[in-house]
Amino acid sequence: MEFFNILQSACNDVNLDFNDKKYNQLISYKNLIQEWNKKINLTAIVEDDEIIKKHFIDCIKIFKSSPIGEAKSLIDIGTGAGFPGIPIKILKEDIEITLLDSLQKRINFLNIVIGELQLKNIQCLHGRAEDYAQEIQHRQKYDIAVSRAVANLAVLSEFCIPFVEKGGYFIAMKGPSVEEEITAATKSIEILGGKIEDIMKIDIEDTDLKHNLVIIKKLRETGKRYPRKPGIIKKNPLK
């Protein structure tokens, strides 16, 4: 009951319904993470309490951003163990989710999670964001692109903004010190057709975690040359 109450309280804070079905799905997901983490490197966070707070509640906090609540489709880029895409799907069943990751072992794990939790309207893609963002079925097709991946904001923006339709949003889940990244990325975001609309500070109760949600609105279509070829983006971020 302790974990149920913690998760329910976090959902209440962002006006999300929470029930036994969602709780059981999250606990099953936690158990699968712990089981599979013995075989492949999914996360350094493995204790029950830490998974609940540092992964699940961190993902719940993204619903503080109103675009998530209104979205019909979302792509999670560099999803890793499925964060934040899987928790978003569990908590908002009507959204269509695409999970993108470059490592096949993680995709195999995510497909197991999807099957075990009986999640619908969710797919996994194995490959590079740079490649999929040039494909017609994915380019500028999503209401929301989100990423919790570890990369600077200029790099993440070039990976993610091309997936977002005009009028949609890219939401970057960043750490506590984001000011320098924002300053360095502002021009690249503009080049890609976006503009920073909001920066939301996130505190995770009973932990030392402090995060920021950087909310970027897509104002114009992204030029055809972006994203650039694999390898170039990290070596030469847009300025």
From Swiss-Prot:
Claim: 4Fe-4S is one of the keywords in the record: no
Keyword Methyltransferase on entry: yes
SUPFAM superfamilies xref list: S-adenosyl-L-methionine-dependent methyltransferases
EC number(s) on file: 2.1.1.-
EC class of the enzyme, as a word: transferase
Binding site for S-adenosyl-L-methionine: 78, 83, 129-130, 148
Compartments where located: Cytoplasm
GO MF term list: rRNA (guanine-N7-)-methyltransferase activity
Keywords: Cytoplasm, Methyltransferase, rRNA processing, S-adenosyl-L-methionine, Transferase
Main location: cytoplasm
Alphabetized HAMAP family for the sequence: 16SrRNA_methyltr_G
The family this protein is said to belong to: Belongs to the methyltransferase superfamily. RNA methyltransferase RsmG family.
PANTHER family: S-ADENOSYL-L-METHIONINE-DEPENDENT METHYLTRANSFERASES SUPERFAMILY PROTEIN
NCBIfam families per UniProt: rsmG_gidB
Entry protein name: Ribosomal RNA small subunit methyltransferase G
Phylogenetic lineage: Bacteria, Bacillati, Bacillota, Clostridia, Eubacteriales
